[in-house]
């Protein structure tokens, strides 16, 4: 993630927000005007209205000088979806579990794509059918759950902000029939090499939401944050998500080159972190800490081929310093 931003606690929002390093920290003393950054306690990045996030970054509005061009070749294959472009902001209204095929799904640095859905449990499935990778460099916003499926690869840029109620990015494909039947099994596309998914940006989802990054190789160098939900980095050839609202995950790995790497920060406040692959490397931060007295998070690191390089910081405890579960398997 771009290092001109860092996480600070907002007393007004009661959450961590990404802010410019040129700004000062929020007030945590009893004296007015005394400000300092939070350094000792991890708090979640709660799902906020996009305006709050933009204001915290010093972006009161999005420039309208660039015509939105990152989305091309929209074809609705299930359900309904309508698209409206206003300058560099693209708004899509979709029905529950709508499926949209795209020739190109990119979000440029000055662009914003917003999915307006029927409820927080609604989902939209976006699939890229060309041979182009997806590059998300701008803002992706939704009140529901967003799936992005591109077997060619997905890169989330250092200035990107993803702010949804649930987010799944996968370089493994899923058939329309499986989506309609709510059988969320993603697997390698025939005659295609396993592609990589990389996150350099900021991904936040709503309370109890989930973030799933799925591919042949998965790498996080940015910040991922959920509140009571789950974060999964899954590298393999076949992944099944049993329930997209309250996800539990099964997976199979048949190739030793599948690798999951975390060099960034992953926060699951009282939730679950799953990193599963043939090979795992962690040099960043994995935190499932909870401010609740009774609830602790869980962290599972599962290296199917038995190779796990575990460094960085790993923490799962509640307010009473009682630990959650940390499981490392090979």
Across the structure, where does each feature detected by a protein language model lie?
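Extracellular and secretory-pathway beta-repeat/beta-biased strand scaffolds
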Residues: 2-4, 15, 24, 28-51, ...
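Active-site and channel-lining beta-strand-loop segments
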Residues: 6-9
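IQ-motif-like calmodulin-binding regions
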Residues: 12
């Amino acid at each position: 993630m771009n290092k001109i931003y860092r996480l600070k606690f907002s007393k007004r929002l009661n959450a961590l927000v990404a802010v410019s390093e040129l700004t000062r920290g929020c007030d945590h003393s009893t004296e007015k005007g005394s400000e300092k950054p939070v350094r000792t306690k991890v708090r979640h990045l709660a799902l906020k209205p996009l305006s709050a996030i933009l204001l915290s970054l010093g972006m009161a509005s999005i420039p309208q000088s660039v015509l939105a061009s990152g989305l091309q070749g929209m074809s609705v294959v299930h359900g309904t979806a309508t698209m409206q472009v206003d300058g560099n902001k693209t708004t899509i209204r979709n029905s529950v579990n709508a499926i949209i095929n795209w020739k190109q799904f990119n979000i440029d640095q000055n662009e914003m794509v917003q999915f307006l859905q029927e409820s927080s449990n609604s989902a939209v499935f976006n699939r890229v059918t060309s041979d182009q990778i997806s590059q998300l460099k701008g803002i992706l916003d939704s009140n529901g759950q967003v799936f992005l499926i591109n077997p060619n690869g997905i890169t989330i840029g250092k200035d990107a902000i993803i702010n949804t109620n649930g987010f799944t990015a996968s370089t493994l494909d899923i058939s329309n029939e499986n989506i309609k039947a709510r059988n969320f099994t993603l697997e390698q596309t025939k005659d295609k090499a396993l592609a990589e998914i990389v996150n350099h940006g900021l991904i936040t989802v709503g309370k109890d939401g989930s973030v799933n990054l799925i591919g042949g190789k998965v790498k996080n160098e940015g910040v991922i944050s959920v509140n009571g939900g789950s974060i999964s980095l899954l590298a393999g050839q076949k992944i099944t998500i049993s329930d997209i609202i309250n996800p539990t995950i099964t997976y199979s790995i048949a190739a030793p080159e599948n690798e999951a790497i975390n060099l960034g920060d992953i926060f699951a406040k009282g939730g679950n972190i799953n990193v599963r692959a043939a090979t795992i490397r962690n040099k960043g931060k994995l935190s499932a800490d909870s401010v609740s007295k009774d609830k602790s998070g869980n962290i599972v690191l599962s290296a199917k081929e038995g190779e796990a390089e575990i460094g960085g910081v790993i923490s799962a405890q509640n307010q009473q310093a009682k630990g959650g579960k940390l499981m490392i398997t090979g």
